[in-house]
Structure formats: structure tokens, C-alpha cells
């Protein structure tokens, strides 16, 4: 057995992956608490902006909840939320989208055909430059001023203000305004928890962007007014945003999400600040698009595979933006920054391949490692738990079932979901058989009508007998098929109930990773 085969054998078990996952996965109760307050804050803020500013009220269309939290790739507490406020400007459906800088586009209006509002309105008439391009700096400046003015800090010379819910005169929480890039960040605090909300104005489009590798889907895409400091006409360039497409890609390949979260956890523990979350996700987009991700492998082996892909990207100094290969996301990183992370990463990969039990010392902080040891010591004093058998590779995990229930539940949910889909497909096939039999009977009936009438005694009544025989056969077949359909529908109901029972004990991401919708 060569070295590669030995390493693969060592990486079959997901025991260490499961241990680390305890410190990565968001808990359902905690997530619900943050999400509840965030939803109320969102409703309140949008309501205030619409009430205070006529331009926003007229051109605001809806809200897009974005970011790693809604992609289910978030690590740690849900303390950051992205809130994209979609604006629908006059004549936006007839604009020309032109190529801008790599990763960016320009929005060109035909000044001969645009509505008079662009020249007559005291706000909008400032947003187009002399060439008819929408100026992202001007729109962003309006947005920032509008937010500051509308939210109206409770005290002078303060960026803090109170947020009220619709149904109460008591403050829901307090928020503070901070500026960061194209976003306006609100630091929300209700006394028991704190999180950040990035407010970003975005424009929505349904026409195809000027990108060669773009495959049109049903969902729209967006442009964001990201500020640029240098280069030609920076205010004409708008950053692409394909959030719906990226979310769908991850949804179709659910097994990648925990691996993305583990790499983000490694980054946080190792303090690799140069490795943005979006860079990690982009690496996965490239691998998924090439079908290089074998989801039948253990998560540990897939994790090591993706760490090696990350190392390759660092060595080449190249990580292309998935939607525009001319844009290198690593372009602004220095060689010293890249080399330092790459050397450390290569050492970690080598150590894990040699001994997977070393994973915890790289992925977990000292405090988390200590907590894990306490958990393991406590388990030693308790009655022996059932050992979780990893059905994907036939090996028993050395990690007790009590700590692998999340993974096991996901497997059960996926299996029951697959059973449900199989039953649905069987029902579909049976119904198609019924339709086929009906069509066959109809064709036979038509053929009888088209035959010349034979008046000889020998053949008289033969066609009627054949039709009755076929009709009887059809009736019996339909009865049997209906019985089968009923049996399968009962089986689906039972499967739904089993999934519901499993989910009632699951964490937020245990459910969401499977892609199985919550059942009422």
C-alpha cells in the first residue's frame, strides 16, 4: 500500500470532524433568538425609511436577506446579517449593461429615451454622469445621507438611536450607525445580545449580464455600488452580486456546507484574516462546477481535498472570481501575506494526513480544546454509549453516539427523504400507467370505429367482445393501481412523520444541510 492509499484509509472516519463540528454548528434555539430580533429590526428600519424619505418610498421594492447566515455557511454565533435593499429605478429595465473593470459592470442609460424624472427630479438628476452612466458614488451618497437623516439619533452628536416594534411603544433595542464600504452597518443591542446589520442599496436585473460563462436561471441578479478609489471612472463601476445563484449551487450540493464552515473555523482559529469568507466559497464554486467533488467520500477526506485546493490557489497566487475569470480575488494580496498562510496550511495538511486526530489542535482554540477534553473525560465516567457506525465506509467511529447524533440525524433525514422521493416517483409511474391504459383503450375504440363493418355471422360481435375484454382488463388494472397509489401515499405520510420526529431534535444546520423542508 503506497503513501496516498494509507492516507486515504486514515481519513475514512469522520470522528474528528464530528468533534470539531460541535464548535462550528449554530444551535437552533440560539439562531431563532437572533433571527427573531433581526426580523423585527428589519421591518422597523424599512418602515422608518419609507416614512421619512419619499425617494426611498417610491423606488424601494423589497428586501433580500443575504450573506453566509442565509447560505448556511456561517461559523460561530449569528452576529452578522446582510440586508440588501433592492431599488427599482425609472427605466432600469431598458438600460444597457456594459463590461466594466473585471468583476464589475457599468449601467448605461439612453438619455434620448429616459423619463423626464431623471432631469426634473432634484435628487435623481444628480445620479447620471455626463455620459449617461449611473454614478454609484452619487447614489451611495444619497443612501447614506437618507439613512442618517431618517433614523434620527436619539441624542445630538450621537450615532445611536432606538428601534421600536410595530406593536409596542417601548424600545425594541438600541442601534448605532457605522460606515463600512458600500454598506451602512447598524450595531444592534437589546441588552442580552448584539449583532451587526449591513444595509446595502442594490439594483436588480433580469437581463443577462455581459459575462461569457453566465448560465441564465429564473432568479434575478444584482449590482452593488461598491466604492473604488483608483482606476478609470471608478464611479461608473458597479460590483456584481449573484447571491441567488450561489445559494442555489450550495443548496444542490448540501454536503459542502459543513466543509466550508470547517475551513472558516480553521481560518478563524489560525487568524488568517486575508482569507475572506467569500474567497473560501468561491473555491468551492470552482470545484463544484468541474464536478470534482465526490460527495460519496467521507467529510474528512473532502475537507483535506479542499484544503489542498486552497493551497494550490495560494501557490499560484490566483483565485478567479467565479462569474468573471478575468478578476483575481487574490490580486490585492501581497506575496508575503500569501506565503505565510500557505506554509502554515501545507504543514497542517501534512499533519492531518499523517494523523487525523491532530485536527482539533489546528481547528479549535485552546479554550475549545480544553472544553472538548472535559466532555470526553465526562463521557468516560458515564455508561458506555452506542458506537456510531459510519455506513459510508463500513468503519466504526471511536466517537460515542451522543456526540455524533447531529451527523446520524442528517443521515436519517436524508435516507427518509430519499424514501419519500422514491415513493413519489413510484406514484408518478403508476399514474402514468393509468393514463397509458386509458390511451390504449381510446386508440382501440377509434380503430374499431374506422374498421369496415363485417356483416358475416362468423365475425358478428367479435369487436364488441374484444372491447369488453380490454375494458374489463383496464378496470382491474386501474383498481390495482389505485390500491398501490394509496399504499404509497400512506408510506409517504409515515415517512414525513419520521422526518418530523427526527427534526424535532435537530439543530438549525442539521436540518438545513439536508435540504429537506421543514414540515408543518
Swiss-Prot record:
Cofactor: Mg(2+); Mn(2+)
UniProt keyword Transferase, yes or no: yes
Residues binding GTP, per UniProt: 198
GO-annotated molecular function: 2',3'-cyclic GMP-AMP synthase activity; ATP binding; double-stranded DNA binding; GTP binding; metal ion binding; RNA binding
InterPro entries hit by this protein: Mab-21-like_nuc_Trfase (IPR046903), Mab-21_HhH/H2TH-like (IPR046906), MAB21L/cGLR (IPR024810)
Binding site for ATP: 68, 80-82, 264
Enzyme class: transferase
GO terms (BP aspect): innate immune response
Binding-site positions, Mn(2+): 288, 294
Record-listed Mg(2+) binding positions: 80, 82, 198
The enzyme's E.C. designation: 2.7.7.86
Reaction catalysed by this enzyme: GTP + ATP = 2',3'-cGAMP + 2 diphosphate; GTP + ATP = pppGp(2'-5')A + diphosphate; pppGp(2'-5')A = 2',3'-cGAMP + diphosphate
Family the UniProt entry places it in: Belongs to the mab-21 family.
Known role: Nucleotidyltransferase that catalyzes the formation of cyclic GMP-AMP (2',3'-cGAMP) from ATP and GTP and plays a key role in innate immunity. Acts as a key sensor of double-stranded RNA (dsRNA), the presence of dsRNA in the cytoplasm being a danger signal that triggers the immune responses. Directly binds dsRNA, activating the nucleotidyltransferase activity, leading to synthesis of 2',3'-cGAMP, a second messenger that binds to and activates Sting, thereby triggering the immune response via activation of the NF-kappa-B transcription factor.
Protein's name in the database: Cyclic GMP-AMP synthase-like receptor
Amino acid at each position: 500500500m503506497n503513501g496516498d492509499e494509507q492516507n486515504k484509509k486514515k481519513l475514512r472516519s469522520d470522528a474528528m470532524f464530528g468533534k470539531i463540528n460541535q464548535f462550528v454548528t449554530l444551535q437552533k434555539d440560539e439562531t431563532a433568538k437572533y433571527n427573531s430580533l433581526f426580523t423585527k429590526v428589519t421591518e422597523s428600519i424599512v418602515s422608518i425609511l419609507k416614512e421619512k424619505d419619499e425617494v426611498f418610498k417610491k423606488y424601494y421594492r423589497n428586501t433580500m436577506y443575504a450573506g453566509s447566515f442565509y447560505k448556511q455557511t456561517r461559523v460561530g454565533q449569528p452576529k452578522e446579517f446582510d440586508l440588501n435593499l433592492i431599488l427599482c429605478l425609472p427605466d432600469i429595465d431598458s438600460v444597457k449593461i456594459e463590461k466594466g473593470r473585471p468583476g464589475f459592470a457599468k449601467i448605461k442609460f439612453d438619455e434620448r429615451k429616459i423619463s423626464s424624472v431623471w432631469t426634473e427630479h432634484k435628487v435623481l438628476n444628480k445620479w447620471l454622469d455626463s455620459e449617461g452612466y449611473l454614478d454609484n458614488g452619487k447614489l451611495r451618497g444619497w443612501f447614506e445621507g437618507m439613512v442618517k437623516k431618517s433614523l434620527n439619533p436619539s441624542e445630538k452628536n450621537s450615532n445611536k438611536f432606538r428601534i421600536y416594534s410595530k406593536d409596542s411603544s417601548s424600545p425594541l433595542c438600541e442601534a448605532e450607525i457605522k460606515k463600512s464600504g458600500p454598506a451602512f452597518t447598524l450595531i444592534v443591542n437589546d441588552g442580552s445580545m448584539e449583532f451587526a446589520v449591513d444595509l446595502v442599496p442594490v439594483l436588480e436585473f433580469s437581463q443577462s449580464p455581459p459575462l461569457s460563462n453566465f448560465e441564465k436561471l429564473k432568479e434575478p441578479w444584482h449590482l452593488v455600488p461598491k466604492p473604488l478609489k483608483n482606476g478609470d471612472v471608478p464611479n461608473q463601476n458597479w460590483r456584481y452580486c449573484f447571491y441567488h445563484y450561489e445559494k442555489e449551487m450550495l443548496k444542490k450540493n448540501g454536503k459542502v456546507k459543513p466543509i466550508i464552515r470547517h475551513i472558516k473555523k480553521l481560518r478563524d482559529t489560525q487568524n488568517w484574516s486575508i482569507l475572506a469568507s467569500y474567497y473560501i466559497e468561491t473555491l468551492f464554486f470552482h470545484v463544484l462546477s468541474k464536478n470534482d467533488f465526490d460527495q460519496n467520500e467521507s467529510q474528512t477526506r473532502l475537507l483535506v481535498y479542499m484544503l489542498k485546493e486552497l493551497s494550490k490557489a495560494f501557490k499560484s497566487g490566483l483565485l478567479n472570481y467565479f462569474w468573471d475569470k478575468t478578476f483575481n480575488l487574490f490580486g490585492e494580496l501581497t506575496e508575503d501575506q500569501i506565503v505565510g498562510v500557505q506554509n502554515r496550511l501545507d504543514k497542517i495538511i501534512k499533519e492531518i494526513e499523517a494523523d487525523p486526530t491532530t485536527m482539533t489542535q489546528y481547528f479549535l482554540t485552546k479554550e475549545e480544546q480544553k472544553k472538548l477534553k472535559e466532555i470526553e473525560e465526562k463521557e468516560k465516567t458515564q455508561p458506555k454509549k452506542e458506537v456510531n457506525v459510519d455506513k459510508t465506509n463500513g468503519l466504526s467511529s471511536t466517537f460515542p453516539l451522543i456526540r455524533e447524533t447531529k451527523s446520524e440525524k442528517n443521515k436519517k433525514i436524508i435516507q427518509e427523504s430519499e424514501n419519500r422521493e422514491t415513493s413519489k416517483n413510484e406514484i408518478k409511474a403508476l399514474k402514468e400507467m393509468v393514463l397509458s391504459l386509458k390511451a390504449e383503450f381510446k386508440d382501440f375504440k377509434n380503430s374499431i370505429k374506422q374498421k369496415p363493418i363485417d356483416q358475416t355471422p362468423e365475425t358478428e360481435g367479435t369487436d364488441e367482445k374484444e372491447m369488453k375484454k380490454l375494458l374489463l382488463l383496464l378496470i382491474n388494472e386501474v383498481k390495482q393501481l389505485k390500491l398501490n397509489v394509496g399504499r404509497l401515499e400512506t408510506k409517504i405520510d409515515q415517512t414525513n412523520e419520521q422526518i418530523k420526529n427526527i427534526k424535532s431534535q435537530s439543530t438549525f444546520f442539521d436540518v438545513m444541510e439536508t435540504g429537506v423542508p421543514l414540515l408543518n
